[in-house]
């Protein structure tokens, strides 16, 4: 496999000013910055507004013995834009709190959102869902599920969560993906990864 390296690094950006424009459940900062151009020169000062919400950890719980994945269904206000439904099928995910490790978040959110106990975690990918406007990085895992509260409604009451837990065969989950029924990027990435690597990982987990 050939290497494709990036032209510049963090030393090639200079943030001259940062100002918080809004601070509520989320935060919006305005940055005045300069960065190196591909001809080697520097840009003039540019204003960019950045949505700050911290990092998140996500996990796709997978019961390898039955070859079924755990998906959760919940309401998402960002999808109130004329779509057929603002409820989505998703993987488990949550924000990383100060002092928490990624594994801690994965286990906590699996229990809170799906009543799901995990006995193994495998990192899949770390990525920026919208780096042109948001600083959030998501770290995605696949987890070996021991149990789950399938058919139950879970979530944290104080966070107004109302989450329905589903168990879907791996084959049916991929079929939902191919039919366009999965419409959020995190779950699309997780299921595409499972479609490519699931057979190998299932064999490893069933016969360690």
Where are these regions (language model features)?
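Conserved hydrophobic "DFG−1" position in protein kinase catalytic cores
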Residues: 33, 61, 71, 142-143, ...
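Acidic/glycine-rich phosphate/pyrophosphate-binding loops and surrounding catalytic core
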Residues: 117-122, 128-129
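Acidic, metal-coordinating catalytic segment for phosphate/diphosphate chemistry
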Residues: 21-66, 80
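Active-site-adjacent beta-strand/loop module that shapes the phosphate/pyrophosphate-binding cleft
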Residues: 33-38, 130-151
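Helix N-cap/coil-helix junction residues
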Residues: 115-116, 182
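Conserved Nudix-box catalytic region and its N-terminal flanking loop in Nudix hydrolases
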Residues: 48-53, 60, 68-108, 150, ...
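Short loop segments at secondary-structure junctions
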Residues: 36-38, 63-65, 75, 144-148, ...
């Amino acid at each position: 496999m050939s290497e494709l390296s990036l032209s510049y690094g963090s030393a090639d950006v200079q943030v001259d000013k940062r100002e918080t424009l809004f601070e509520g459940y989320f935060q919006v900062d305005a940055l005045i910055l300069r960065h190196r151009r591909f001809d080697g020169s520097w840009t003039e000062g540019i204003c960019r507004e950045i949505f700050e919400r911290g990092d998140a950890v996500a996990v796709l719980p997978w019961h390898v013995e039955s070859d079924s994945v755990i998906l959760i269904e919940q309401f998402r206000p960002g999808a109130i834009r004329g779509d057929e439904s603002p409820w989505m099928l998703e993987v488990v995910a949550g924000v990383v709190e100060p002092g928490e490790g990624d594994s801690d978040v994965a286990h906590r959110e699996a229990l809170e959102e799906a009543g799901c106990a995990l006995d193994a975690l495998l990192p899949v990918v770390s990525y920026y869902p919208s780096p042109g406007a948001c600083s959030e990085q998501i770290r995605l895992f696949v987890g070996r599920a021991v149990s789950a509260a399938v058919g139950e409604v879970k979530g944290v009451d104080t966070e107004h969560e109302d989450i329905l837990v589903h168990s879907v065969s791996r084959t049916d989950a991929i079929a939902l993906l191919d039919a366009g029924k999965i419409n959020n990027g995190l779950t699309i990435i997780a299921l595409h990864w499972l479609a490519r690597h699931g057979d190998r990982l299932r064999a490893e987990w069933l016969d360690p």
